[in-house]
Amino acid sequence: MGSMAQKSVLMLCGEFMEAYETIVPLYVLQAFGVSVHCVSPGRKTGDKCVMAAHDLLGLEIYTELVVDHLTLNANFDGVIPDQYDAIIIPGGRFTELLSADEKCVSLVARFAELKKLIFTSCHSQLFLAAAGLLTGGMKCTAFESMKPFIELSGGAWWQQPGVQTLFEITDCVKDGSFMSTMGWPTLGHSLKVLLESLGSKISSSKENHQTSLLFLIGDCVEDYSINVPFKAFQALGCKVDAVTPTKKRGEKCATIVHDLEDGRQLPTEKFGHNFYVTVAWDDVSVDDYDCIVVPGGRSPELLVMNPKAVELVRKFVEKGKFVAAIGMGNWLLAATGALKKKRCASSYGTKVAVKVAGGEIVESERCVTDDKLVTAASTSDLPAFLYALSTALGLSVVF
């Protein structure tokens, strides 16, 4: 899996950008060989932008929770639009500030002039309105509070038909070189459209077989280590489910994000987006899936105390299925025998567990594949993890 001619994408960033709408496309594109430059006006390489999670937490409007930071890897002033295949603008409050910034609006307008792909999400459609790009009835969707401004700007509001709730929305709309989404709940499908729009070919080595993955989670699962691979494998056309022993289909699991703040030995834990269980425990059959994935966070510590969870992983191992873990996910795998005599990646938090379970830690590698076991040390290793696990499952993305 790889890229014959490397694609390059620009991501326009700012304070309080939506974390999920930033990290998911960033890591997925990086996993499949796309270069992504993250920039913000007035800031340079190495500077940081605060990211926030936006979710419905029982109030009439979404709640904003500061979660962590993104480190910029390029300079805004050095951007040459001709050198990129697309621009991605996540949602979040920074869009209100930067959509009034002449340099940012001109940048977006230049991408439109070059007919480069412009990917907007949630509230970042403000840039399209500011640049006068919606005139003539261009089809556009966004978070519903944006509807009046899209229509006042000459755009044609598009909404996925037949949905009753916000979280039933899974689709996006593309009109020419403009692509818009309601927000992070739609990322599985919108990433598929994004990859295809960049010229990718997604294929599987197994003809007439839909690859299927089961994510084993619980409360305090790490936000990115469930959301990034879950949406990534949806984008690759896989059947993807999430299950937990103690909750029904449609119920929520709280997620957490670990943010390493200056001067601290360990990261600060913060709440992230809620994640919805997609399948009931009693409806899960090991034979229906090719792989089980145990994300990180503190949920593995919860699951290791539940005999049902331990036995489920053990059944995947016994049946020769693929088993994968991220970060603290090794904690649960250690209790199932999945790590015995296996090479694996490990964070400091699971080194003792891996060793006493008979595993071999590969200190020099952040993501390791050993036969049908794929492990990543931390969430920052998710691009490598996505590449390794998709390759192991016979999936390829070629540009």
UniProtKB/Swiss-Prot annotation:
GO CC, alphabetical: cytosol
Domain of life from the UniProt record: Eukaryota
Domain PfpI endopeptidase: 7-199, 211-394
Swiss-Prot/TrEMBL keywords: Repeat, Stress response
Oligomer and partners: Homotrimer.
UniProt similarity note: Belongs to the peptidase C56 family.
Purpose: May be involved in oxidative stress response.
Protein name from the UniProt record: DJ-1 protein homolog F
Native species: Arabidopsis thaliana (Mouse-ear cress)
Gene name of the encoded protein: DJ1F
